[in-house]
A protein has these predicted regions:
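Conserved N-terminal beta-strand and adjoining loop/helix that marks the start
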Residues: 1-16, 37
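Charged phosphate-binding loop/patch that engages nucleotide di/tri-phosphates or the phosphate backbone
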Residues: 123-149
Length: 149
């Protein structure tokens, strides 16, 4: 089963997202990526925060798991920025790496006001966007479980 680690980084009533433009589609995703062999989901989340956002983070808590069909599980962590500069990602999608293809689209790190999350139908996973809205109002509870087909 493929495991993906994602982060929820909130500052000043805004959440960090990656704005994507790919194959004529415009959408937003929570930062994250695949867990490499020998790596824990927590380690992957920390690595992905640096690669995609340019920030160092500390894990606060696991907030959600999303089962995607039979082949993938996404784990999301609430994180706190401890260093780095937002928008200075070092991942291959931001550099002239030979292994990155422009066909993979454009990645732009952004801060989206949390009150705007509810008005965007193109934030993925939508369950995590709804969880952020609810949890900012009511507080973070135990791990939420979601399933996507």
């Amino acid at each position: 089963m493929r495991i993906r680690a994602g982060i929820v980084l909130i500052q000043n009533k805004k959440v960090a997202l990656i704005e994507r433009h790919r194959a004529g589609l415009d959408y937003f995703v929570f930062p994250g990526g695949g867990v490499d062999e020998g790596e824990t989901p927590e380690q992957a989340a920390i690595r992905e925060a640096m690669e995609e956002l340019g920030v160092e983070v500390a894990i606060q808590q696991k907030v959600a798991e999303v089962k995607v069909g039979l082949k993938s599980r996404h784990i999301y962590f609430l994180v706190e920025q401890t260093g780095g500069e937002f928008g200075t990602g070092i991942g291959e999608e931001y550099t002239d790496s030979d292994s990155y293809s422009p066909d993979e689209g454009i990645y732009i790190p952004i801060w989206m006001p949390i009150e705007e999350l509810a008005h965007h139908q193109n934030v993925y996973p939508a369950d995590i966007a709804r969880l952020v809205i609810k949890s900012v109002r009511e507080g973070w509870m135990e791990v939420s479980l979601f399933e996507e087909l």
